[in-house]
Amino acid sequence: GLELAKDKGFDYLTMKALADKLNVTPMAIYRHVSNKSDLINSVLDAFVCDVDVCNHEISNLDWKEWLRATYTNMYISLKNMPSLHPYLGNAPRFGPNAMEVLSKILSVLRTAGFNQQQTINATSSLTGFMIGCSIMDIAFHQSLSKSQQSSYIPSTIDSGLDHIFTALSLELEANNKAIAVS
């Protein structure tokens, strides 16, 4: 399913198209997924596994460097598969690969000292920022050559991450001061 979505886009991902690609009947596909929504969720989760946005060791980097690498990888992956964007907000559940990525992000933030609500807010802000940037950059990326696309990471991404990390660092400092006072 992921290969079909990469080749033709998510709009062309249907039970029949997948069955044709696999040389089976559409009914054979229904033995594994109950409907198109399940098929899309399975392919979204396969995409998360395939791009491996967290392919770097947590222990080797501080929380900001690790998150910068993770979210930059996410940005690059999302901009390279624009047909995925309409489905990001419509997935009824996270698959195991997406849950693993989320778990790693939450763990890095909690280990850095953020409380539970701050961790959720930070994850939401960073993810929303990266998805938004990738969507906004699609038109621009489509006008670049393939070699330019693979090496382009706009400075607005780094600048935006710097701003978010500054705000998160201030929040973490306030946490540490509050703990020291109590």
What residues fall within each predicted segment?
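Alpha-helical structural segments
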Residues: 3, 7-8, 38-54, 65, ...
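Helix-turn-helix
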Residues: 3-38
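DNA major-groove recognition helix of helix-turn-helix
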Residues: 33, 43-44, 123
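Amphipathic alpha-helical interaction segments
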Residues: 38, 69, 100, 104, ...
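Hydrophobic alpha-helical connector segments
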Residues: 53-90, 97, 116, 123-126
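C-terminal peripheral helix-coil segments that are non-catalytic and often amphipathic
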Residues: 111, 139-182
